[in-house]
Amino acid sequence: MAAEEMQWPVPMKAIGAQNLLTMPGGVAKAGYLHKKGGTQLQLLKWPLRFVIIHKRCIYYFKSSTSASPQGAFSLSGYNRVMRAAEETTSNNVFPFKIIHISKKHRTWFFSASSEDERKSWMAFVRREIGHFHEKKELPLDTSDSSSDTDSFYGAVERPIDISLSSYPMDNEDYEHEDEDDSYLEPDSPGPMKLEDALTYPPAYPPPPVPVPRKPAFSDLPRAHSFTSKSPSPLLPPPPPKRGLPDTGSAPEDAKDALGLRRVEPGLRVPATPRRMSDPPMSNVPTVPNLRKHPCFRDSVNPGLEPWTPGHGTSSVSSSTTMAVATSRNCDKLKSFHLSSRGPPTSEPPPVPANKPKFLKIAEEPSPREAAKFAPVPPVAPRPPVQKMPMPEATVRPAVLPRPENTPLPHLQRSPPDGQSFRGFSFEKARQPSQADTGEEDSDEDYEKVPLPNSVFVNTTESCEVERLFKATDPRGEPQDGLYCIRNSSTKSGKVLVVWDESSNKVRNYRIFEKDSKFYLEGEVLFASVGSMVEHYHTHVLPSHQSLLLRHPYGYAGPR
């Protein structure tokens, strides 16, 4: 028996599939089978492999043109081949296993595409493991594969009687456990690309994005550095970013556009009375300019009333009463502002005395000034100014937004109709400003917005991602450029998966990291995955002529 054992061949480690097939003699059977993964992380994976039975050894390759085997093992010591009913699933309907006489040796699992294929493979394996036991075991005719199923499997699955002691524990079997480390960058030969774009099932424990689990893996610095940046702004930024463009950007444009219009009435109407009543012109004009502005705008409201109906007497009487009320408010406000600022103390008495004159002056030329001041109420930024002091307090201190905060409540309480009218008209003025500023600020805001959580898919399998993509469309036709980011099946990095409508399949791009920079190809480096994704929204992906990132998976809002 020992002499027989010496004749068991040892699998060759560096031989291509085609070389093995063309070797004279020895090849019993060759074809594609699904092989179960060998490590704990690959137990649920059944990648398709090109399997060759050659001289009592089994080799499996990634494809029929691979230059070297993915793994190989000798059938020495294996004494039984059986159906693997426990491994039967909807994807693996015809599995079988090759069992060693020693429980310390690995049991190999394969899955055929049909019942006849399984019978054929099991018959050939049975014949190979019984090669040196033909005198004890009847040779099995492969033609039995078409015979009765029970009788066939009964003969094939019967164990071969061999001695355990004659099979040493050390052998020359080997297997590359990085068998699923193949991420094809499609249609382009390159150093990073392996021979096939097979997809692999899900069984990678850590989820893709959540922060709590990532720190547990100390050996994943780049994944941690990537995810630690994105979750922190995920919750806070969306509310401010939705609020800021409405409150911040629109008032800035409104103020830029309205600043000139506000200066014009301030110069035309109140400028001459200031010179008469306020001799010092050093820093006083800026203060009364803002003080008189609210009062003057209130006088514009009565000015609008006589202009629209065209009645002079009633409008003058109502406007005078409004002028008295507003002048009192202005007196209080001016005394408050003067007391807070402190430089001029002699101004409060003359200013209220002149205030009714300003109002009358504004009322007398109402027919002529109506054309000038008619656009002022709709353009006056009453609603936004309430929100502006927060950003504008530091940006434009010279405009003195603080005095405007205090008169606003009084002015809004006294003429509710006028304020509501300005509110409606200002909504019309705010919409174009939002559209204009949205284009300018969108790039800056987008750089700060992290990728949505839905982009990160908790799977290591491309076919699972393809299933998710097809589920987004009732007809099973995903949008071109639909993309997500999944985990790598064996590495600690990420994989960008993109739906290519032209070829009707997903494309896988490994996301590499070097010196805290991310890239798909070495020529273009990015500081973060988000900036890389943004880049490929406008630039064609590597190894493709027209594929762009267009639609993040699971994100319904605008980009």
Curated annotation (Swiss-Prot):
Q: Which UniProt keywords apply?
A: Phosphoprotein, SH2 domain, SH3-binding
Q: Which residues form the PH domain?
A: 26-130
Which CDD domains does its entry note?
PH_3BP2 (cd13308), SH2_SH3BP2 (cd10359)
* Keyword field contains Phosphoprotein: yes
Biased segments, Acidic residues type: 170-184, 437-446
Location of Phosphotyrosine modifications: Y174, Y183, Y446
Could you describe the post-translational modifications of this protein? Answer: Phosphorylated. Phosphorylation at Tyr-446 may stimulate the activity of the LYN kinase.
Name any Gene Ontology BP term. Answer: signal transduction
Which InterPro entries does UniProt cross-reference here?
Answer: PH-like_dom_sf (IPR011993), PH_domain (IPR001849), SH2 (IPR000980), SH2_dom_sf (IPR036860), SH3BP2 (IPR035848), SH3BP2_SH2 (IPR035847)
Q: Which residues form the SH2 domain?
A: 455-553
Gene Ontology MF: a single term = SH3 domain binding
Q: Which residue stretches does the UniProt record annotate as biased composition, category Low complexity?
A: 313-327
Q: Motif SH3-binding: which residue numbers?
A: 201-210
Give residues where Phosphoserine occurs.
Answer: S277, S414, S425
Domain of life of the source: Eukaryota
Which SUPFAM superfamilies did the record assign? PH domain-like, SH2 domain
Ranges annotated as biased composition (Basic and acidic residues): 252-265, 360-371
Which PANTHER family does this chain map to?
SH3 DOMAIN-BINDING PROTEIN 2, SH3-BINDING
Q: What does this protein do?
A: Binds differentially to the SH3 domains of certain proteins of signal transduction pathways. Binds to phosphatidylinositols; linking the hemopoietic tyrosine kinase fes to the cytoplasmic membrane in a phosphorylation dependent mechanism.
Q: What is this protein called?
A: SH3 domain-binding protein 2
Q: Which organism is it from?
A: Mus musculus (Mouse)
